[in-house]
Amino acid sequence: MATTSSNVENFSPQIIKQVAREIHGLTNDPPEGIKVFSNDEDITDIQASIEGPTGTPYEGGIFKIKLVLGKDFPAAPPKGFFLTKIFHPNVAKNGEICVNTLKKDWKPDLGIKQVLLTVKCLLIVPNPESALNEEAGKLLLERYDDYSKRAKMFTEIHAKLSASSSNNISEGQQESLPGKKRVAVNEKMCDKKKKDKKRALKRL
């Protein structure tokens, strides 16, 4: 049940077909650790769940997110929201996601898959410089252990309630992912950024 009105009537048949095709592909062959739920009644309201990446304060959690396609999509980026409460510098208290891919770095050919991978990468490498949650951004930069404890507590309370019902995202589906290599490259980039960030934080 979307809280925003549908923009389907504002889309050309070509855009509707393009979005429907991509969502269908993502539903049947999702990126690793991500599950996409199709909404036949409103393709402009896309919901997905993301597994908390290993080695982060979000590990073990299942985070539900929503992407809302505006009437100018794909010329304008979708809006992203976490439906699951999360303690993260780039997620506002109302769930709004702040990431450059959804703002100044958006390109019409990026597609829904790239947005989902970017949001997952944000869980691995937060960006405190563009924080929507200033408290989380400050803790990340100045007291990482406190930030990690708070983020883990939020994960434990809010993101693990539905984890048991979504455990099979990574088990049954991961073995048959033809696009896994591309995702692995993306994950390596995230890992490298994470290590660089940790080194930088240690020097502070």
Curated annotation (Swiss-Prot):
Q: Which family does it belong to?
A: Belongs to the ubiquitin-conjugating enzyme family.
> Annotated pathway, please?
Protein modification; protein ubiquitination
Q: Does the keyword Cell cycle apply?
A: yes
Give the function comment from the record: Catalyzes the covalent attachment of ubiquitin to other proteins. Acts as an essential factor of the anaphase promoting complex/cyclosome (APC/C), a cell cycle-regulated ubiquitin ligase that controls progression through mitosis. Acts by specifically elongating polyubiquitin chains initiated by the E2 enzyme UBCH10 on APC/C substrates, enhancing the degradation of APC/C substrates by the proteasome and promoting mitotic exit.
Lineage of the organism: Eukaryota, Metazoa, Cnidaria, Anthozoa, Hexacorallia
Q: Which domain of life is it from?
A: Eukaryota
Give one GO term, molecular function aspect.
Answer: ubiquitin conjugating enzyme activity
Protein name (database record): Ubiquitin-conjugating enzyme E2 S
Task: Using the record, list the residue span of the signal peptide; answer none if the entry has no such feature.
Answer: none
User: What organism does the UniProt record list as the source?
Assistant: Nematostella vectensis
